[in-house]
Amino acid sequence: MTSRTLRAMTVLTAAAALCSAAPTAYAAHTTTATTTATAAAAASSAQAADRRVPRIVTAWARAWNGSEPRALGALFTADGTYTDEAVAATFRGRKEISGWKARADSLIGNVHVTIRTTRSDGNRITVRSVYSGHLKGAPKPFAVPMTTVIDLDRHHCRIVSNKDHYSLATVLAQSGLPADWTPPTT
């Protein structure tokens, strides 16, 4: 059992024990046992739901892993934004976002995003993944943890905002490049 499941069962068990108006210890035990079994089933179901990756996230990873920059741009609303926090760059609209993907492909060989977990909350999805590739001209490839916060439109069909968070210092260190390295401008 995970600590999350144990914590949920402990809280529900304590709540059932405190709220129980059962006249005997046996009745209280029966209520607590039933509540614990129900809580365990609910926690297990919630964990199974967390393992399902939302369709838009699968499409997002497929677009990053593919070679067609417009596939990434097409996932966004017309005025959507893509922010790469590590390089302090924001792109607006499908054309700029597609251009960012094309630039990334020209600088990084074998760009790949591997989804580890997702967490949905309303129109927001937090994606934990591994961002990997090989900066062109670098002696070694990199693979760093990345967290992406994706905000969806009200229909959950398109991305309104995407913010990637990863360590550029770690990318450069793993790649064998100096900390002040900058990509070529052409």
Roles of regions detected by a PLM:
Residues R52, E96, F142:
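Soluble or luminal CAZymes and related metallo-dependent hydrolases
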Residues A59-R62, V87, S161:
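Short, flexible active-site loop motifs that bind/organize anionic cofactors or intermediates
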Residues P69-D121:
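A solvent-exposed, acidic/Ser-Thr-rich amphipathic alpha-helical stretch
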Residues L12, A17, T38, G99-T186:
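A beta-strand edge to alpha-helix "cap/lid" segment located at domain peripheries
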Residues W60-A63, T83, H134:
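Alpha-helix C-capping/helix-to-loop hinge sites
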Residues T2-L6, T10-A74, D180-T186:
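Short, low-complexity N-terminal intrinsically disordered segments enriched in polar/charged residues
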